[in-house]
């Protein structure tokens, strides 16, 4: 009999390597009407960092680029920001994000998809840029990436 944290187990616990059970690396996606902010965790999930902003204004839906980034970084989890209303319900923006996420899962069925409440993530990103001495209005592309970092941070706090 084995004991773990005061709980008796009738079988020897299975030991899996961290790389087999870890949801990392993960890709954070901040989907917007004209841009998508992308961020990624490192392999251990210690630190998320900005990756790029995908411009949607020229007819691209960004799906192929997200696929390429996911494959290049060997991503296991897509963390998509879901814009909920202040009362926690889903509005039109959330429905658009879910529709986009469906396309992502059809294209990348081997990845785990997770939604995270992104309420105020762009405001938080703007505040962080301001604190760093950057003019947020002049840094729209960067704001989307920092918002994606914030989405990953929230998810990492949830799974910690």
Regions found by a protein language model. Give the residues of each.
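Phosphate- and other anionic-substrate recognition elements at nucleic-acid/protein interfaces
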Residues: 2-27, 34-160
């Amino acid at each position: 009999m084995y004991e773990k944290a005061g709980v008796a187990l009738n079988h020897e616990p299975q030991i899996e390597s961290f790389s087999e059970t870890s949801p990392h690396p993960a890709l954070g996606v901040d989907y917007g009407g004209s841009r998508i902010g992308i961020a990624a965790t490192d392999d251990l999930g210690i630190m998320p960092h900005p990756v790029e902003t995908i411009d949607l204004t020229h007819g691209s839906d960004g799906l192929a680029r997200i696929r390429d980034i996911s494959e290049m970084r060997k991503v296991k989890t897509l963390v998509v920001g879901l814009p909920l209303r202040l009362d926690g319900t889903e509005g039109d923006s959330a429905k658009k994000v879910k529709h986009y996420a469906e396309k992502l899962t059809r294209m990348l069925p081997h990845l785990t998809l997770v939604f995270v409440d992104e309420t105020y993530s762009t405001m938080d990103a703007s505040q962080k840029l301001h604190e760093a001495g950057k003019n947020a209005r002049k840094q729209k592309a960067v704001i989307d990436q920092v918002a994606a970092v914030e989405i990953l941070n929230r998810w990492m706090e949830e799974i910690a």
